[in-house]
């Protein structure tokens, strides 16, 4: 079975910075794109997607008194290649998608509140625009003849760093973490 479709939803993202300099909060963004799915065996198949993902993080400088003293927003083109597994019948299915995720940074923007103390990474460009990680998630879908309507949540742990990580650099780790919740619509071709 071959399926093509569209997906869209919300993303919740943050960054792991080691050493930790400030408290960080999640940033809410959007994501969406197109998907292709091939079911080769009962209950198993492959799925590839091409998405645009908004990610980033917020920081609260201790003692600043504001909810956010710094914010970094990233826009990435995103390519997850997933093992697709499902259980259920021809009408209602539970789904599980797991696999690698490759992303490339399209743009980056920063906001630093006046009076905040600039830190090492404030104003620093992203050193590694190509990002890779592992994604996994699950959800449910409804099959109505050739049409599939679904809802899925995913977690991505990026294993690559945004900033250089040599001994002489500022950070040992600077990896993104992203949670997405998407609705999708697919059409079975054959």
Please identify what each model-predicted range represents.
Residues 2, 10, 14, 37-111, ...:
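Gram-negative (and chloroplast) outer-membrane scaffold detector with strong preference
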Residues 2, 24-30, 73-79, 92, ...:
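Residues that define the transmembrane beta-barrel architecture of outer-membrane proteins
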Residues 11-35, 163-165, 170-171:
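Surface-exposed strand-loop-strand hairpins of Gram-negative outer-membrane beta-barrel proteins
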Residues 18-22, 64-70, 119-126, 167-173:
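Extracellular loop and loop/strand-boundary signature of outer-membrane beta-barrel proteins
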Residues 49, 126, 131-190:
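Predominantly the C-terminal beta-signal and adjacent terminal strand-loop region
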Residues 112-120:
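Solvent-exposed loop segments that connect transmembrane elements
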């Amino acid at each position: 079975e071959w399926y093509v479709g569209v997906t869209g939803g919300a993303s919740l993202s943050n960054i792991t910075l080691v050493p930790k300099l400030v408290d960080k909060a999640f940033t809410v963004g959007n994501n969406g794109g197109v998907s292709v799915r091939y079911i080769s065996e009962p209950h198993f198949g492959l799925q590839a997607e091409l998405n645009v993902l908004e990610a980033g993080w917020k920081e609260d400088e201790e003692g600043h008194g504001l909810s956010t003293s710094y914010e970094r927003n990233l826009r990435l083109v995103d390519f997850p290649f997933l093992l697709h597994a499902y259980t259920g019948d021809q009408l209602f299915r539970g789904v599980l998608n797991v696999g690698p995720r490759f992303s490339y940074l399209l743009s980056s923007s920063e906001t630093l509140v006046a009076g905040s103390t600039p830190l090492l990474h404030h104003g620093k460009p992203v050193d590694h625009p190509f990002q890779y990680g592992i994604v996994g998630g699950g959800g449910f879908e409804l099959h109505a003849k050739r049409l599939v309507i679904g809802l899925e949540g995913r977690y991505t742990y990026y294993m690559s760093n945004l900033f250089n990580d040599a001994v002489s650099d500022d950070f040992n780790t600077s990896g993104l973490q992203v949670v997405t919740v998407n609705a999708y619509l697919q059409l079975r071709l054959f």
